[in-house]
């Protein structure tokens, strides 16, 4: 274990050695500016209170200096910025009383040995039920990941005295329409502003294209939320869109597909209503607490490798204990296994079935595009509505109702049309 812990820091020093940030050690000259170790902590609350986040840094080493000559208290600044951003974003996104525990100036290998600013962030307690209700949620993981990214960005730019720009959020309301010109498709979407970060506005977009079962191309840069493309009849085309600015590129949109039949008889609309990503089913009673993977293992973003096994210890009185029977104890049957999640690529699967059926063309869209009037159901004689594992779950913060109230009204109107 000591070799493992020390190797992390020594690897950083070897990579950054001979760079401007670590000029006094031999190495590969990679200009690494800081290092952060993301940990989970132990500890539990019997009253379902949040344990929260802790930051660790070390100043009492190398005469209080880092190898570039700056004060080791730069590591404290890094920890402070990260904890502030994590707490702020979690509280605003989840209305959760997320706790900022403290900052420890202590002698830990991962914060003592690196020659550059370094911190350990103990994000949450893996032993605490309240923390893990959020910790298993892929939406929470995205929020935390983005908060950490923003915190690192703030720290690095403050060291250089420069302003920063945060990469945009993913686009929404993605839709494919049949073009006005022969054998063309028109793609539309909406760029999203980040209410937590005014610099994250999208400036341009990249449209990625896939033909059939091939891979996506390197993308086409467009300045507006619109893209027209000529297609070859008989081939299924798939698209995904990212937003970009000077800060970087967003996560991709869902993948939508379209197909122009060679001898078109009719046109079909595929609506992707499967947006859900979530943690496993929650058990929360006065006597029992935990996660029921057998009832519902949740829906990871793409996939998940974080489960050891099915939970067997649910007794609240055994919180804080270890071993069989303790709260949170599980089997090991899922160790090393990858759990399938939401690929956001199901209009292609449904579309291939439509292609095989004969002379039917199709386009696809997000359910938000229908709800917001961008796509009209009445324009299509057949609508294929994908729901997958979509469902409403009171235990989760995100809203994944299968048919929202606006969608219910639109479907009713379409059926009466």
Residue ranges and their predicted role:
Residues 155-199, 233, 248-266:
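Pro/Thr/Ser/Gly-rich low-complexity, intrinsically disordered linker/stalk tracts
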Residues 203-207:
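Short beta-strand elements bearing conserved aromatic residues within extracellular beta-rich modules
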Residues 228-249:
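Beta-strand-rich modules
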Residues 217-224:
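Short beta-strand segments within Ig-like beta-sandwich modules, predominantly Fibronectin type-III
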Residues 19, 35-65, 93-162:
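Active-site-adjacent mobile loop/cap segments within catalytic or ligand-binding domains
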Residues 417:
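Conserved small/polar residues in nucleotide/adenosyl-binding loops
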Residues 255-381, 386:
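Aromatic-Pro/Gly-enriched surface loop or interdomain linker
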Residues 1-51:
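Catalytic-core regions of hydrolytic enzymes
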